[in-house]
Swiss-Prot record:
InterPro entries: Ribosomal_Su5_D2-typ_SF, Ribosomal_uS5, Ribosomal_uS5_bac-type, Ribosomal_uS5_C, Ribosomal_uS5_N, Ribosomal_uS5_N_CS, Ribsml_uS5_D2-typ_fold_subgr. With S4 and S12 plays an important role in translational accuracy. Located at the back of the 30S subunit body where it stabilizes the conformation of the head with respect to the body. It comes from the Bacteria. Residues 12-75 form the S5 DRBM domain. GO terms for cellular component: small ribosomal subunit. The N-terminal domain interacts with the head of the 30S subunit; the C-terminal domain interacts with the body and contacts protein S4. The interaction surface between S4 and S5 is involved in control of translational fidelity. It holds the Pfam family Ribosomal_S5_C. The keyword Ribonucleoprotein applies. It comes from Azotobacter vinelandii (strain DJ / ATCC BAA-1303). GO terms for biological process: translation. Belongs to the universal ribosomal protein uS5 family. This is Small ribosomal subunit protein uS5. Keywords: Ribonucleoprotein, Ribosomal protein, RNA-binding, rRNA-binding.
Length: 166
């Protein structure tokens, strides 16, 4: 599993999570294509992921990066960590992420680590259960981050003050 990182001129951090070779068998033999899974973030709470397919690896990666930039979401962080513990699932992959104290670092594996790094999370404890397929882990991580809300937004929805919520 590749874990390349680039910093672009737009200020986005780009990470390559996975490149996969796929074969289609035809009458004359096999046709190989490549799929790429990438994550892009600004390190301040905006993060996106994308998948790209092509006959060449660089083209697949480029398509995935463009898809990731189009598919960005805003994550409400509490400083350098999460607001509260989050559970999420996609397919057979289940992820659990919980906030950690300052200086803990990102304790997460594989694809989940890449997503959290580009999102700007610096202190988190995370675990992946079930399938560790990078595509499903990235989807599950995004689902969990997307569902997370700040105390201010919860208070506004309920028509109460933040102190009453906490």
């Amino acid at each position: 599993m590749a874990n390349n990182e680039q910093k672009r001129d737009e200020g986005y951090i780009e990470k390559l999570v996975q490149v996969n070779r796929v074969a289609k068998t035809v009458k004359g033999g096999r046709i190989f294509t490549f799929t790429a899974l990438t994550v892009v973030g600004d390190g301040k709470g905006r993060v996106g992921f994308g998948r790209g397919k092509s006959r060449e690896v660089p083209a697949a990666i480029q398509k995935a990066m463009e898809a990731a930039r189009r598919n960005m979401i805003q994550v409400d962080l509490s400083g350098t960590t999460l607001q509260y513990p989050v559970k999420s699932a996609h397919g057979a992959s289940r992820v659990y992420m919980q906030p950690a104290s300052e200086g803990t670092g990102i304790i997460a594996g594989g694809a989940m680590r890449a997503v959290l790094e580009v999102a700007g999370v610096q202190n988190v404890l995370a675990k992946c259960y079930g399938s560790t397929n990078p595509v499903n882990v990235v989807y599950a991580t995004f689902k969990g981050l997307k569902e997370m809300q700040s105390p201010e937004s919860v208070a506004a929805k309920r028509g109460k003050s933040v102190e009453e919520i906490l």
